[in-house]
Swiss-Prot record:
Protein location: Cytoplasm
Alphabetized GO MF terms: D-tyrosyl-tRNA(Tyr) deacylase activity; Gly-tRNA(Ala) deacylase activity; Ser(Gly)-tRNA(Ala) hydrolase activity; tRNA binding
EC primary class: hydrolase
Listed name of the protein: D-aminoacyl-tRNA deacylase
Organism: Dictyoglomus turgidum (strain DSM 6724 / Z-1310)
Subunit-structure text: Homodimer.
Alphabetical list of InterPro entries matching this protein: Daa-tRNA_deacyls_DTD, DTD-like_sf
Length: 156
């Protein structure tokens, strides 16, 4: 699983011009699911995001998690996070999970996050969405469960 996480002042999703969901201060998460992903990846990624200290404390240091600031979360499915652009001019999406697996894991990821955080909103799976956001910072973090499962590198 791969997530592009953006700290936002606010974000919203529209489909066909209709407002589907919106959040105030919090995290906008673009979520991609690959063929290789396992059920355990849902918990690994959701736990990491819920505890990630990327909000500023009273000293301006990134030291607080989404839970500690009572922030909102907006999750948007995005299979294009698994685009392979190594050859040719058109991205190849064969590493992305098929729609049945992707929908299942997406729903489970959102449900798991809802157990960790007060307010979790979502886009519409497989819909063409207009996503609006106001970045806060900007702070953008990319997480991939393939990397999260590897041992930590030693500092040199």
């Amino acid at each position: 699983m791969r997530a592009v996480i953006q700290r936002v002042k606010k974000a919203s999703v529209k489909v066909n011009g209709e407002l589907i969901s919106q959040i105030s201060q919090g995290l906008l998460i673009f979520l991609g699911i690959s063929k290789k992903d396992k059920e355990e990846d849902i918990k690994i990624l959701a736990d990491k995001i819920a505890d990630l200290r990327i909000f500023s404390d009273e000293n301006g240091k990134m030291n607080l998690s989404i839970k500690e600031v009572n922030g909102d979360i907006l999750v948007v499915s995005q299979f294009t996070l698994f685009a392979d652009c190594r050859r040719g001019k058109r991205p190849d999406f064969t590493d992305a999970a098929d729609k049945e697996k992707a929908l299942d894991y997406y729903k489970k990821f959102v449900a798991y996050l809802k157990n960790k955080s007060e307010k979790v909103e979502e886009g519409i799976f497989q819909a063409y969405m207009e996503v609006e956001l106001i970045n806060d910072g900007p702070v953008t973090i990319i997480l991939d469960t393939e990397d999260l499962k590897k041992p930590r590198r030693r500092k040199e």
